[in-house]
C-alpha cells in the first residue's frame, strides 16, 4: 500500500512536489461526453499545465536550492509549497469524484477520447505543448498513477480555473512577470500559421493571459493590415473588414502564414451585396447564406 499523501509530500521539497504536480496532468483523460468540445478542452488542460510549468521555469525551481528543502525558511517558498500541495489535492479530489461516477455510470459513458480523435492542427498543438513541458520537467518522486478520466466540462473547468488561480498566487509571490511573458512568447515561437494561433488564443482565454496575448500579437503580425477609409451599406449589404478563418481551416490541414495588405478608400454596399476586405481561408464562412 502506498504511503498517505501527507507523509510523502512532507518529505519533499517544493521542487519535488512541483514536478509531481505538473505530472498529474499527464494522467487525465477526457470522456466522450465532451463531444465537439473535446479538442478545445484538451488544449485548455494543456495550457494550464504549460502555464504552471512556465512559473517553475521562471523561478528556476529545479536549480535554486531554496526549493529543495522539505522545511523551507523563506516565506515565499513556504507559500509556494502550500499552493503546490493545494494543486495536488485538487487533482486528488477530482479523481475521487470521477471514480464515484464510474461506479454508477453505464459502460458506454466511460469511453474516453484519444489523441487520434483530434483534428490535425489541434493534435499538433497538443503534442507541441506536451513536448514543451516534458523538456522542462525533472523526474517525479511520488508513486506512479494510472490514467483516470474527467467526464464533464464543469469538472474540467474547475481544474483549469483553480490551477490558473493558484498560478496567479505563485506569480504574485515572485517578481517574474516579465520573464513569464518572454517565456510565453518563446513557447509559440515556432507556431507560424494563423489558424493554430487563433486556436491557442481561444483555448488560453481566461486561464493564461500571457499566452493569449502572445498569440494575439503574433496573429496581428501575420495577417498584415486590412483597412477602409469609408464604408457605407444599404439594406442587407454586408462588409467584412479583416481576414476570415473558417471552421474548416481551423480543424483541417491548412497553414496560414502569409502577411497581406488589403486597403480600399471607399466601399458602398447595396442590396444583397457582400464585400470582404481581407482574405478568406477554408471552406464556407462569411459568404454563406
UniProtKB/Swiss-Prot annotation:
Subcellular compartments: Cytoplasm
Gene Ontology process terms (BP): apoptotic process
GO function term, MF aspect, one: identical protein binding
Keyword Cytoplasm found: yes
Result when mutating residue 33 to P: Converts its specificity to [Het-s]
Region entry Globular domain, spans: 1-227
One protein family per Pfam: HET-s_218-289
Keywords linked to the UniProt accession: Apoptosis, Cytoplasm
Xref: InterPro entries: HeLo_dom, HeLo_sf, Het-s_prion_dom
Cited function: Responsible for heterokaryon incompatibility, a process that ensures that during spontaneous, vegetative cell fusion only compatible cells from the same colony survive (non-self-recognition). Interaction with the prion form [het-s] of incompatible cells triggers a lethal reaction that prevents the formation of viable heterokaryons.
Domain free text: The globular domain exerts a prion-inhibitory effect (in cis) on its own C-terminal prion domain. The het-S globular domain, but not the het-s globular domain, is essential for programmed cell death. The protein contains a prion domain (PrD), but beta-structuring in this domain due to incorporation into a het-s fibril induces a change in its globular domain, generating a molecular species that is incompetent for fibril growth.
Subunit description: Homodimer. Forms heterodimers with het-s.
Protein name per UniProt: Heterokaryon incompatibility protein S
Organism: Podospora anserina (strain S / ATCC MYA-4624 / DSM 980 / FGSC 10383) (Pleurage anserina)
Amino acid at each position: 500500500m502506498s504511503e498517505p499523501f501527507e507523509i510523502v509530500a512532507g518529505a519533499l521539497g517544493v521542487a519535488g512536489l512541483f514536478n509531481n504536480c505538473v505530472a498529474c496532468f499527464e494522467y487525465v483523460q477526457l470522456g466522450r461526453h465532451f463531444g465537439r468540445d473535446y479538442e478545445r478542452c484538451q488544449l485548455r488542460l494543456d495550457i494550464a499545465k504549460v502555464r504552471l510549468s512556465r512559473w517553475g521555469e521562471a523561478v528556476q525551481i529545479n536549480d535554486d536550492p531554496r526549493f529543495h528543502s522539505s522545511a523551507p525558511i523563506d516565506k515565499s517558498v513556504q507559500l509556494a509549497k502550500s499552493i503546490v500541495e493545494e494543486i495536488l489535492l485538487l487533482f486528488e479530489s477530482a479523481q475521487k469524484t470521477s471514480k464515484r461516477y464510474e461506479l454508477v455510470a453505464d459502460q458506454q459513458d466511460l469511453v474516453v477520447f484519444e489523441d487520434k480523435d483530434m483534428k490535425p492542427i489541434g493534435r499538433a498543438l497538443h503534442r507541441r505543448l506536451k513536448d514543451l513541458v516534458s523538456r522542462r520537467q525533472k523526474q517525479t518522486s511520488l508513486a506512479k498513477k494510472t490514467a483516470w478520466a474527467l467526464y464533464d466540462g464543469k469538472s474540467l473547468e474547475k481544474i483549469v480555473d483553480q490551477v490558473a488561480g493558484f498560478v496567479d498566487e505563485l506569480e504574485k509571490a515572485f517578481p517574474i512577470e516579465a520573464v513569464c511573458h518572454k517565456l510565453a512568447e518563446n513557447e509559440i515561437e515556432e507556431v507560424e500559421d494563423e489558424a493554430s494561433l487563433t486556436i491557442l488564443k481561444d483555448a488560453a482565454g481566461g486561464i493564461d493571459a500571457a499566452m493569449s496575448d502572445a498569440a494575439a500579437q503574433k496573429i496581428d503580425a501575420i495577417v498584415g493590415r486590412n483597412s477602409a477609409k469609408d464604408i457605407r451599406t444599404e439594406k442587407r449589404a454586408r462588409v467584412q473588414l479583416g481576414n476570415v478563418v473558417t471552421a474548416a481551416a481551423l480543424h483541417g490541414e491548412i497553414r496560414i502564414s502569409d502577411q497581406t495588405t488589403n486597403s480600399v478608400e471607399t466601399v458602398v454596399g447595396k442590396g444583397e451585396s457582400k464585400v470582404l476586405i481581407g482574405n478568406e481561408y477554408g471552406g464556407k464562412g462569411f459568404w454563406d447564406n
